[in-house]
Structure formats: structure tokens, C-alpha cells
Amino acid sequence: MDQTYSLESFLNHVQKRDPNQTEFAQAVREVMTTLWPFLEQNPKYRQMSLLERLVEPERVIQFRVVWVDDRNQIQVNRAWRVQFSSAIGPYKGGMRFHPSVNLSILKFLGFEQTFKNALTTLPMGGGKGGSDFDPKGKSEGEVMRFCQALMTELYRHLGADTDVPAGDIGVGGREVGFMAGMMKKLSNNTACVFTGKGLSFGGSLIRPEATGYGLVYFTEAMLKRHGMGFEGMRVSVSGSGNVAQYAIEKAMEFGARVITASDSSGTVVDESGFTKEKLARLIEIKASRDGRVADYAKEFGLVYLEGQQPWSLPVDIALPCATQNELDVDAAHQLIANGVKAVAEGANMPTTIEATELFQQAGVLFAPGKAANAGGVATSGLEMAQNAARLGWKAEKVDARLHHIMLDIHHACVEHGGEGEQTNYVQGANIAGFVKVADAMLAQGVI
């Protein structure tokens, strides 16, 4: 493309190349819209077709996964690995197992992951992978056979210095263990090729908690910069998986009253707030094969909003921790009308572009996921460091490093987030992540 093109012409170029990849186009639009004024002031970043290269994955691997279920029936799923950018290190990003998984979603996640990983300051590139396999309702044997079948193709594309996957939606410690075990068998090599492993074979303490803890560390720093804090705040959390659980735990430690959790079927509301005992029971229920938030609500006699999200309730802080585009304009209007002070993304792109703009216009503090939920991948990087050194750190050391990294990410966002009274964290995160990746790409030439 001509180096003098406009923002809209660039976005149209991206849309035209992949007209059906709406999630990916949305992610590119969100990033480029905030970057464009910076790019106009720094024209070196529009040379050498850098932007065109940045929005095109270095490699996409697509393959079928053939496995046998418990009824001895042959099943066929699709799987992908998007190796988006290795400019600053090996590809790094999770594997997602969910029926909604497609190439557009994985490209959007890999694109976001590239900037998120850059923000951590650790030497990690960006990638993402997954399958339309649904682990819900499957036996452990079926999940194991699927993971092993998937690895018979994927293993040849991974390596400790090439591509290091981790977990994501539908992929927890069990699935990581199955995949890592098959990788070891096929490659005859025990080098670190997965993070989020069990502690018995190279995992890191605090890794399961890291995304949720990091979200709260970042949000607390954001609140403090603007004269507030979690202490005494009413908090709504969406989701009830790994990120939501540990965000609830850490927010409680900081003195917040967390009143909601949710899943795809509805929301539980506890006006008195979660306690350690209640949270432990929720985690136990969700760990069971068919555990739902509705079961937790029934057990404790709590309000259950069937088919609803938590955003209609009056709260001070909202932490969307479920899935992409869960918080739309209507939900944003409700939160703003009820006096929300801050929104921080625990999930990947859970807030639509329109809702994000609405929060910013209303003066609501807004922390984008690429900064706020970077704690998970940051601790994955720390797990890689421990594996490389053949060491295991104590939980306190990992947690302290995580806290420090999240404060560094917050500082980078503030540095690039404008000079007004209120920091534009979307702008700050996008520019800070972009500059690191772009400088590396320019230094390495046209490759």
C-alpha cells in the first residue's frame, strides 16, 4: 500500500483481505484507531510496510483432529495454531477448546497477544491456537484422546525457543498435562513447550492465579493513580472460571465487596459479598463435570438471574472475566447510569468498541485486557525462566515478580496514555506494546 494512506483505507484493506473475520477486524480497528495519531507523528512506523506485516500472521497452521469417543465412534474436529509474531521472542499464547473457535477468533487473540506479551517486557512473541472441540460433557478419557490426537500434528510446530502454548478457555491444567505428555513422547524431549503445567512436572506456583491476581493488581494501581482503591468498593465480576475466581479472591483481599459471578446460563447475586468459604465452594462446584453457578446460588439461597449478565446491578467496579464482546453498549449504559467508576478487562476483548468509547466519554476509568489481564502470560514467562534454569521459585517470589510486572505495565500505559487528568489506558497500552514490537521489526529488516 501507499505509505500516505488513511486510517479508513488501511482498515478497508484489512477487511477486504478477510471479509468474514469480524472478530479480527474488530481487534485491528480498536488498536489502529488509537495508534493512528501517534503514527502520524512518528512516520518511521509507516515505512517498510510495517503495518501491513503487523496485521498478517507469520504462519497459520490448520489441521484436522481425528479421535475416538467412548462409544467407539470416530469424531473429527478442526484445530489451528496462529503463529502471529516472533519479533521479540518465541510465539506465546494459549490453546482454546470451544465450539465457537474459528480462525477469526484465533487471529484476533494472537494479534492482541502480540501487544500484551510486549507489555510484559519479557522476550515473548504472540500466538494463539485452539479447536472447535467442546470438552464440556466429555469423559476424561475422551478429553485425553482428543488432546493426544491433536498433538500428533501440532508437536512438529512447537519448541521451547519456537512456540510455547498454554491454557485458555476449555484448556486447564488437565488438558495441558495431556498435551505436554504427548509432546514429550513424540519429540523424545522434555524441554519446556507448554506453560500452565502441573507442579509435579515443571509448573510454576501462582500460575493458575496469575491472570486474576494481575487484573486486580493493575486495577488497584489505576484506581490509586486517580485517588481511589478497592477498599469498600462494590464489585461485579462476570464469569466463574479461573480468571474470575482469583480476581474475586484478590479483590476481597484488597477490601472489596464482590457481589456477582456468572456463567453462560446466568448470574448469581450475593449482596453481602463473597467470603473465602463461599468462594471455595464455588470453585469446588465449578470443578465438577457439570457444575453451574445456578447450583451455587441454590445451595446458598442467593438471587439467581437466569439468562442475564451482571451489568444491570449498581457497582463501583466492573471486571468482565468471561468472553469476548460480553459487555455491549446497552450494558455500558446501565453501568454508567448506576455510577460505575472503573471497568477492567479480565477476559480478552470482552468490551465492544462502542462500549469502550462510551465509558471513556463518560469519564469511567477503563483498563483494556492487553494490559489488565497480562498477568497470566507474564507468569507463563516466569515459568519458562524457571524451566530454563531448572529451578522452582517460592510462591512469594513469583507473586512479587507478578505484582512488579503489573505495576511496570501500568507505568507504561500512563507514559503513553495522554496528559489529561485521566489516563487513556487503551491508547497507552496500544502505543507501548506497538512501539516495542515495531522497533524490533524495523531492526530485523524485511522478513
Curated annotation (Swiss-Prot):
Temperature characteristics of this protein: The enzyme remains active when heat treated or when left at room temperature for several months but is inactivated by freezing.
Site (Important for catalysis): D168
Record annotation: effect of changing K128H: Reduces catalytic activity and increases pH optima for activity. Increases relative activity with amino acid substrates other than glutamate, especially L-norvaline
Enzyme nomenclature, EC number: 1.4.1.4
Domain of life according to the entry: Bacteria
Keyword NADP: yes
Binding site for NADP(+): T211, N242
Record CDD domains: NAD_bind_2_Glu_DH (cd05313)
pH dependence of function: Optimum pH is 8 and 9 for the reductive amination and for the oxidative deamination, respectively.
EC top class, as a word: oxidoreductase
Coiled coil feature spans: none
Reaction catalyzed: L-glutamate + NADP(+) + H2O = 2-oxoglutarate + NH4(+) + NADPH + H(+)
Transmembrane residue ranges: none
GO molecular function terms noted in the UniProt entry: glutamate dehydrogenase (NADP+) activity; guanosine tetraphosphate binding; identical protein binding
Induction conditions: Induced by growth on glucose and ammonia.
InterPro entries noted in UniProt: Aminoacid_DH-like_N_sf, Glu/Leu/Phe/Val/Trp_DH, Glu/Leu/Phe/Val/Trp_DH_C, Glu/Leu/Phe/Val/Trp_DH_dimer, Glu/Leu/Phe/Val_DH_AS, Glu_DH, Glu_Leu_Phe_Val_DH, NAD(P)-bd_dom_sf
Binding partners and assembly: Homohexamer.
Protein name: NADP-specific glutamate dehydrogenase
Annotated gene: gdhA
